[in-house]
Amino acid sequence: MEEVITIAQIVHRGTDILSLNNEEIEALVDEIYSTLKGSNDIKNIRLIDFLFTLKDFVNHVRAEQSKLPDLSMPMEAYIRQLLVDSDVVPIVSEKKKELRVRPSTRKEIFLINGTHLAVPAEAPIEIYGLKLRLKTFSPQCFMRMAEIGSFSPETLGYVASGANLTNFIRVFMKCVDQETWKKNGEGVVVTTKENIIQFTHQYIELYKFLRSGGHSWLINRLAEEMVHRKLDREDQGSHISNIVETEEIEPEENIKRVIFFLKELSTMYSVSPVFTSGYMPLLYDLYRAGYLEVLWNPVEQKFLQHAEQREKEQMILQQVDMKLMEVTTQARQYFKIMEEKIGRVQSDAIREILTMEGKVDDPNSILQEVIKACGKQEAELITTEYLNIKKQWELQEKNACAHLKLVKQLRSGLQYAESLKVLESIRVLYKEKNNTTNWNLCKACGFKLLCPHVDMLIQLQAAEASYDTMRTKLMKFSGINKEKENNQGLIYSYFCKICGEELAHFIQEDRTADVGVIGDLNSKLRIFIWQETMKACTFIHFGKLVDVKQFANIAVNVCLPLVYSIENIKKEEDYDPLTQLYAVIYIYAYILNLIYSSQKNKEFLTITIHGMKADSSLNAYVTFLLEKMMQQYSGIINQLSEITDQWIANNFREAFKKIIHQNGLQGLSVQDDTKVLLTEILLDPMYDYAATVARIDGSIPMHKPRTPKEAEYEFKTVIGRTPAELLSQKEFYDKIYTSKYRPDFTQLARLKDIYFQEESLRVWWGGRDEEKTSTLIYLRAYELFLKYLQNAPNFNSELAEFKTYENAYGEQKALLAQQGFYNIFDPNTGRADQRTRLFEYKRLPISTLYDERGLPHKWTIYVYKAVDSSQKPTEIEVTRKDVIKKIDNHYALADLRCSVCHVLQHEVGQLNIKKVQTALKASLEFNTFYAFYESRCPKGGLHDFQDKKCVKCGLFTYIIYDHLSQPELVHDYYNNYKDQYDKEKMSIRSIQIKKDMTMPSTETQPKPPQEPWTFDYGKIIKTAKILDISPAVIEAIGAMEGRSYADIREGQGAPPPPTSMDDPRLMAVDSAVRIFLYNYNCLRHVSTFNKPPMHVERLVKHLSYEEKEDLEKVLPNVVNEYHTTFKHLRVTDPASALLYSIEFLCISFLTLYDIKEPSWVVNIVREFALTELNTIIQSEKLLSKPGAFNFMIFGEDFVCSGEDSSMDDISAYSSPGLFGEDIIDRLDDPFSIEDVDISLDVLDNLAPQ
């Protein structure tokens, strides 16, 4: 019987493994490997990787562990001291000649700002056997350490062969002045243009070869004298590996050359303008490919043995991966065949077994479970079908038919005409003609050639058909019921039932169906109809739950074409009141048709009006809708003087007739209440928020639910109840669900620590892992949310601080808005979403706005291009009114023409800009002049118009607003009264200046208070002690703006006492006192409020009405003579007025805080006093100087390990929504619900059992 070695047994055998030598360790690994290599069990095969890791780890632990040096002196000084004996050549100790292997976890080097190399703090750097732990060091420091010692393998990695790097160094030396090398072995920067060009060429060659992955190819290109040896491997074929270098190089010389190469490369990165951060990947690839190991292990014989052993291990691991992939594919196909041939009952049962707790996700176990669940005949059926599929794959892989190249050209063509030509060549190879139900097969090879829907799609695209036409014709290939999609509105994509390719998106249903017919000119009216339909839903009563947003979408599709078909709608693209009124009439006519249809056809969903019976007469509904319309839209109706009630009633009747004639009886099908409610819950942001955090910390699986059991488990974890329990209360639909998922703070802290450990500075470009960074901010926000749920009062201060940092960070992000890309964490997908954010001003000539007469363009004429029956290109120009009548799907919108100057939009750049500027200036001057004399007459008084002409000055009424129809009259009148206009204008300006310079009257001296006031600092100290804050914070009320909060706590940087009665600090403190007194009076007189303020109502909601009336009697009056004293001190002694207000605030607080009776009032008044004063202080604190964005708000471990706190990594914390285009993204889009992809499988799985 085959022996099975488990991980537990290996770990147990490894407890004393440190006492073994290298030969004994290798013997143990060979023994275990020989036991496993003949096994086909996936679990045993996976242990091979563990064995190699174990071997590496043991050797690493056995390595020499030296003590750390005394690093009391600076690192730079320590390295300089080590450089004193410059003639010393590093000697590799005998102990280092032993075989050393890599640890299982690699440490990587990376770049910060192109100037510093850095390593994780855990990675030691070895100098003369001493291991130093550094965070960052400069390239110069890097070179010095390279000169006096060697880097440990944990830091810089390994090479495939010491000779490989030697070859590259030898080629590199040809680019360097040999005399310079001999004179100065320390190395000189390559600065000549010729040498830089030569070096760059070799550099790029090395970079390409490393990226190709073929080390043998690299060696052949860089060193042609290489000798190779063929290594025979058992069950692995052969592999070429370089062994010997024809040029004998001593280890010490090898180290010198490597050090010189690294020194040149590092220095060039620092000082040479030729090299940029784009060259850094070479160091990373050198590290990954292992070309730096020669620094620490120049003993070639031992090193080559290790390289050969490691190559063997890699080949074995590759075979393991291939075996694992093969078995995984086989398991998936078994499962698919089982579902198709036998049914889903057994497959669902196997899924439940495989997803049980404790089960290992092993493809081999899936195969065993599938075979076990089937009978003998069923097992043979599945096995035979899999072999047939596998054979089909092999045949397809070997297929070299000519149709493969044609299909590739067809799907990658850039122009429809080219694709149409390729399609004609493909059609010749069809095995059957006019096939629309299955794949078109190739008559040459018999394999699948092209799906029929692709054939039709290419034809439609070449004919420039509209999206609506393409969608309609391709719908016959869809596997989704069209009616179901229209009625329920829950399906957002269409897929081909033959090949499974996506056909269309629902998001394009309403917004792009008409592109090419009327463009996007009707977007405003479309949104208006959608919004008004949503408002109408407030008085409509539906018999069942209805998706009102989808209902509004249907209303837009019905009403919009009818509104555009009206003859007397203005030709201009004006969003005028008449157009709005017509839209409202058709919306209400559509609602009336739904009500009428539901009465005639009982299969339709019952629709009525709130407060009216379903069987009410049609006249009753008409009366209600007309009254509602005239009441709701009286503002629009009043703008139209010619509109009467009878006009509205007549047009309402005609609109109802049109809808009946065009659509017949219309009804809404009865929707499934369960799916509607569950859709609302699954789209709720709070559900998505809690579910995302639950996935992150492992409370629910990361993948979407695959079975009803998984879906119910996720739903219950997040909501706290099963769907069946929740739906039993759906009659109380208003927010019956709240998220019950509450991970405690310990769990969140543990979760964040895991992410902090993984959050290391990245190799590429020296940036953070932005996806994980965004996730941490997400967790921090959720932690604040939990604190709010548990203790709302104590939450306010932390939230205010969080918002302060958040706002400061938003300002910094705005300054960095020129950066091309931001990574934003998307909680729906769990990964970063890359979006372009470029903020640039586009400069346009003024002729794009105005013509040469200074008039604004009106682009109301649409130019369409088409092809007539004679195949001659034609153009047609129409207005908006004629678009529906004259334009069909064969026309495409080509350009716009101005109805004022008749220039095409693409020709505005050809207008004379100087003429435009001159005319615009004159037009503005005329507009100002005639607006000035619109009512007043230059001859005095007002105009006296008779027969449209002023009898005093001769002004015609029609030239006041129209300056182009009679230019001679306009200029004559302007020239006659230009001087008079200038005089009157200057006269008005002088009067205005005199008025503005009038000094205010002197304020009377306020009366002094009855009792003199003296300052008592003890009140402030006592108040600060109760609030547990510094007294300096209370003293700084009104004076925190622009100061650091740390300085405020210490009492530093306080401004001098006020010397003026208008000092803003006096107004700020006085406002704080008045707010405190106002809220306190609201509390005292709460019984007089019909609806008291929210913060007061929260305090007294448990009191009876009698107790609320008694508050006025039991609570003291704390106002006293505050206003009199403050007014007097503000004028006579502003500094004392500031202290008096602060002291009065503390006295009022202490008076309320120290109330002892009656007992039922004590807690109310004390909580009020604490809340009010804390709110005042926190509000003042928000005005303090925020400074740079402080990432400590998200936790200490969130900050990068290291001293660097520059702004270069700030884009890693980007969170859109505050500036620039992000504001546009947040505009309320009534069609936004269509962008959300709702998985119907999830809704089906959540159905109550």
From Swiss-Prot:
Keyword Cytoplasm (UniProt): no
Keyword Ribonucleoprotein: no
Gene Ontology biological process terms, A to Z: symbiont-mediated suppression of host cytoplasmic pattern recognition receptor signaling pathway via inhibition of IRF3 activity
Subcellular location: Virion; Host cytoplasm
Recorded GO CC terms: host cell cytoplasm; virion component
Induction section of the entry: Expressed in the late phase of the viral replicative cycle.
Signal peptide from the UniProt entry: none
Chief localization: virion
Purpose: Together with the penton and the other minor capsid proteins (p17, p49), forms a complicated network immediately below the outer capsid shell, stabilizing the whole capsid. In addition, blocks IFN-beta transactivation mediated by the cGAS-STING pathway and regulates the transcriptional activity of IFN-beta. Mechanistically, suppresses the phosphorylation of host key adapter protein TBK1 and degrades host IRF3 in the cytoplasm.
Family: Belongs to the asfivirus M1249L family.
Subunit note: Interacts with the minor capsid protein p17 and with the hexon capsid protein p72 capsomers; these interactions form a rigid zipper structure that stabilizes the capsomers. Interacts with host IRF3.
Protein name in the entry: Minor capsid protein M1249L
Organism: African swine fever virus (isolate Warthog/Namibia/Wart80/1980) (ASFV)
